[in-house]
């Protein structure tokens, strides 16, 4: 039996089957993208709910795996050379799983196109949408200074325009369905939660809307959106 006791996180979130990949996450866009990838791959894994509370993400056990105190993180008991490996950062996890299985990243030009759009999401779409959500829906909503809100709403509009142009003639950003789509689309879906579709001009981006609909039609996506359960 695989022994994961060297990973301190397993003391707080104990694995039922240590031979399975362990997912430590919560169903936010960054968490969803990894759960969706695991569902698409059909890999056996064990999800552990890590809430966004300090009691979880700032616990010594979680920090031992991710010193940046953010979900998601994984332990793969069958890592390189057959040895367990722990990883954090959703983009890195997606690339690791794609390379491990040889799926959803492509080869040659498509591989680099996939990496390009994955990095676009990690560096732009996710951070800008997240900050916009803070200022239009969450704790920053009550801040009187309009400039932060205007800044992030404006950047969200710009990024939607970039994606709208990219999708001209494409169903998926890298040609074939890939980890880049798994990274991008959950953040588009978050606009509903932020109640921000109207302010970013969603209806003016029909290709983006159709792209999100295609993504949400996938059975693995529907499963992954709710893993781990919020309950």
Question: Where do the protein language model's features map onto the residues?
Answer:
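GST-like domain detector, emphasizing the conserved glutathione-binding G-site
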Residues: 1-147
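Short, solvent-exposed turn/loop segments enriched in Gly/Ser/Thr/Pro and often Arg
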Residues: 51, 179, 228
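Phosphate-coordinating loops and pocket residues in cytosolic domains that bind phosphorylated ligands
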Residues: 64, 217, 226
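Residue-level recognition of oxygen-bearing side chains
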Residues: 92, 207, 220
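Active-site-flanking alpha-helical
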Residues: 98, 187-188, 225
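GST-like fold's C-terminal all-alpha helical module
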Residues: 118-217
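C-terminal helix/juxtamembrane-tail motif
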Residues: 222-231
């Amino acid at each position: 039996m695989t022994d994961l006791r060297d990973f301190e996180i397993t003391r707080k979130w104990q694995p039922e089957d240590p031979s399975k990949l362990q997912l430590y996450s919560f169903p936010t866009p960054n968490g969803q993208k990894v759960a969706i990838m695991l569902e698409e791959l059909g890999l056996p894994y064990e999800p552990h709910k890590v809430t966004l509370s300090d009691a979880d993400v700032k616990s010594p056990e979680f920090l031992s795996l991710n010193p940046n105190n953010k979900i998601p993180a994984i332990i793969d008991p069958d890592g390189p050379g057959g040895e367990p490996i722990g990883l954090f950062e959703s983009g890195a996890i997606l690339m690791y799983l794609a390379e491990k299985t040889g799926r959803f990243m492509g080869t040659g030009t498509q591989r680099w196109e996939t990496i390009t759009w994955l990095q676009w999401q990690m560096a732009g779409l996710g951070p800008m949408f997240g900050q916009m959500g803070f200022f239009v829906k969450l704790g920053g909503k009550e801040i009187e200074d309009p400039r932060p809100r205007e800044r992030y709403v404006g950047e969200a509009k710009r990024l939607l325009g970039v994606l709208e142009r990219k999708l001209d003639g494409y169903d998926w950003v890298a040609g074939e369905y890939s980890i880049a789509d798994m990274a991008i689309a959950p953040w588009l879906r978050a606009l509903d939660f932020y109640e921000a579709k109207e302010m970013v001009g969603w209806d003016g981006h029909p290709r983006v809307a159709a792209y999100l609909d295609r993504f949400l039609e996938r059975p693995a996506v529907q499963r992954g959106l709710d893993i781990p359960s919020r309950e």
